[in-house]
Regions:
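Surface-exposed, interaction-prone regions used to assemble/regulate multi-protein complexes
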Residues: 1-138
């Protein structure tokens, strides 16, 4: 993938204003071919309860991630409520080769993902159209 294409995609990601935003979900689908990251969005400096950002990594050639399971002691991520979700610290794209790019994602709590994919897309979606794992929890 060419450098200017990577810069354009990085700009689109940066426009989500993801820094310190809550990660509403992370999905790895189709045996790792697609990875979707759902990020809380803001409207006029307030959390947008209707919409969120969906950053999709498509045609993934490699996926590597580390979690904070060793540091979490007894609680499980599946038991998180919306107020206890991870926040995003960094999403950076870089050249990998002519067809792929490398993405590094850092979430607070020592969670790190490295993804080599053919494409990255960014879209704003309605939260009501997605069944987040933390819904309906106290």
């Amino acid at each position: 993938m060419r450098e200017f294409e990577i810069r354009e995609k990085q700009d689109k990601i940066n426009q989500t204003d993801y820094w310190d935003g809550r990660i509403l979900d992370l999905q790895i689908l189709y045996f790792g071919d697609e990875v979707h990251l759902y990020i809380e969005s803001y409207h006029e400096n307030k959390v947008d309860l209707e919409e969120c950002w969906k950053v999709s990594f498509l045609a993934c050639a490699e996926l590597n991630y580390e979690t904070d399971a060793q540091n979490r002691k007894k609680f499980k991520v599946k038991d998180f409520t919306q107020n206890h979700l991870y926040t995003c610290q960094e999403i950076s794209l870089e050249y990998y080769d002519d067809s792929f790019l490398k993405t590094t994602i850092v979430l607070e709590g020592l969670v790190m993902l490295n993804i080599i994919s053919r494409d990255v897309t960014v879209a704003k979606i309605k939260q009501s159209e997605h069944d987040f794992f933390w819904r309906n929890k106290s």
